[in-house]
């Protein structure tokens, strides 16, 4: 490579005024973009042989002139930074079949060090010793003249660095120094290389491409020009532009940007991040809910529920709350001073549902949430007369304080028969094939007292979607307390109980406990 430097005359000294007298067309383009011939140098005898007709045109010369009028600055970093504007040229006059090598170097424009003060550049001292010059060879080299003339020749991958120990081949520069890029066109030898003293080459210099290397932009006009013309200069844009860009991207999705000071929109809105999860649990309303009370309130929510689970699954929460008590506590927002209204509008019919704010429910799948709502359903038998009229569905709507955690062990769901059967004797329920229930050890478990009557909540009935033991002082039944499968009633076991030994509770589907005394 040392021979190449000697052959090209790529001295590392500052670029002198007579340095423009290069072997071939090296003068800058005229107003029409055509370079003019320069006086011949002593090497013109052999260096210009076959190179005299080559012409080079700088691409985007008008943009380079805009920067040059202000004072072009190029950022240098330790990792390396690309130039903007990019160095691109159009080459003509090459032999289509001859192979050429195109390369660049960047040499000091003078021996001064600069500083930017009072909104202008001024000389502040002598330049630091120049680093050993590096050549950047175009990746397509060597290539035929037809290849180079077919399209623009771009050096946009060239990077500038201030790391004197750079191992990546980037051009090493000093900050606050002025530099001049140069383009060299070399005719490849028989080995598709260059470096010998007899290598034919020519050099082209465009003064408008000179720049001062900086680690950060000094002139705000240069910064503005970079922003206006470089689509990748996002890091220099103002905070207002970045905020508007961020908000526009956020609003294009389903997650709206809602300021903290404003009242949040309805959860049932289509733009709510919870709308997709809620619709999985919805019935006929916009949002729906699996939390509805069965105290005479009919709803179509059971249509989307899966088949009942014959055995209750273990639950961590064993507290059973009375449905009427929960409705009174949830709907009396005035009794709790720390509850804040969620929406200022009055509840409507489409908002007549409970909102669940239990944090562990949000990360579950839709099917698991539905099953968990079944397992946690609180059976309300209406055994005791209510002390006050039952509130309507609008009265028990709890839209006003969804921030309060819900009682996960006392969720309420509408229970209606999935497929009502005609009245028949007790034995018919057990002798029919598809209606054999799985009653686990009914004789070994005493039923809890509910009011004055004795009722037993069975684990499963053919027309009962939700099964749960619900007594004032009993917990949830776990699978460990159930009997083995051999104790289940089967087709061959005769049942001789008569209809007068049991009665039904309307709308609930509960079977009473029977004994010899009844």
Swiss-Prot record:
Protein name (database record): T-box transcription factor TBX5
Subcellular location: Nucleus; Cytoplasm
Organism expressing this protein natively: Homo sapiens (Human)
GO terms for biological process, alphabetical: atrial septum morphogenesis; atrioventricular bundle cell differentiation; atrioventricular node cell development; atrioventricular node cell fate commitment; atrioventricular valve morphogenesis; bundle of His cell to Purkinje myocyte communication by electrical coupling; bundle of His development; cardiac left ventricle formation
Mutagenesis / variant outcome for changing residue 237 to W: In HOS; extensive upper limb malformations; strongly reduced affinity for DNA
Residue ranges for the DNA-binding region feature of this UniProt entry: 58-238
An annotated GO cellular component: nucleus
Pfam families, sorted: T-box
